[in-house]
A protein has these predicted regions:
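Short, amphipathic C-terminal "tail helix"
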Residues: 192-228
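Gly/Pro-rich interdomain helix-loop hinge
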Residues: 117-196
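Short alpha-helical scaffolding segments that buttress acidic/His motifs in well-ordered protein cores
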Residues: 43-47, 88-96, 110, 130, ...
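Glycine-rich phosphate/pyrophosphate-binding beta-alpha loops
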Residues: 93-126, 204-209
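Single conserved hydrophobic/aromatic residue that forms the stacking wall/gate
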Residues: 1-8, 12-13
Length: 228
């Protein structure tokens, strides 16, 4: 991706590979912070892909398995364990197989904008926005948050009410992000920036796939939640 701060967006450059080599041993030298942020980006791929407007049965299978693998493996990958690296290599790959067919949502739209305007690492921005966007989207996701909570290892989801399992899924994402050391606020964001940020995110290519249509004013309110 190439960032352009003037328009507040990150533009994707695509060069389709003939073959991709996914080798966890090649990831063993990644710093902890990079492992954490890219892992949360992969989780955002999986959760947004699972809940996007275009989601369907086949991609749901990919995304739920990716959520399960990433949730089980990211802490270990950050600690550089062999099992953690292997699980993340497979989880991020499966998430890519899913979302590349159905697109993403406004967590990515907003993360693209934060990256372009403030040079925020993409995975960090995704991790900040994901639980906020999940809370915003929850009324338009049916029972999918129950399956997200289950895939993330939450116990007793079958006995939970809709309100309870939706909160459990969001809380599980927050805990994983905190456990791998990602902050929940971005001090660079100022009130006077919100209009530009929201306009840019609203125009992002990922925004139309969000399960709940977000207005510019909605996006301003969501950006406000990561302000210090």
């Amino acid at each position: 991706e190439i960032s352009c701060s003037l328009v507040g967006s990150e533009m994707c450059i695509r060069d389709r590979p003939i073959i991709a080599v996914v080798d966890p041993d090649m990831m063993s030298s990644m710093p902890k912070g990079l492992t954490a942020s890219t892992g949360m980006d992969a989780l955002t791929h999986a959760i947004e892909g699972y809940t996007t407007k275009a989601a369907w049965e086949m991609t749901d299978m990919f995304h739920l398995k990716a959520i399960e693998l990433i949730s089980k493996s990211l802490r270990g990958a950050v600690a550089n364990t062999k099992e953690g690296r292997e699980g993340m290599a497979l989880g991020q790959y499966i998430a890519g197989m899913g979302f590349s067919n159905v697109g993403l949502g406004i967590a990515h739209s907003m993360a693209h904008t934060l990256g372009a305007v403030y040079d925020t690492p993409h995975g960090v921005a995704c991790a900040m926005m994901l639980p906020i966007v999940m809370e915003y989207n929850q009324e338009c996701t049916g029972e999918k948050y129950r399956e997200i909570a289950r895939a993330m290892g939450v116990a007793g989801v079958d006995e939970m009410s809709q309100e309870e399992y939706r909160k459990a899924a969001i809380d599980a994402v927050k805990k994983l992000s905190a456990d791998v050391g990602i902050p929940s606020v971005l001090e660079a964001v100022k009130e006077e920036d919100l209009q530009f940020l929201a306009d840019s995110a609203h125009a992002d290519a990922c925004a139309p796939g969000n399960p709940k249509d977000a207005s510019v004013e909605d996006l301003k309110d969501l950006f406000r939640k990561i302000m210090a």
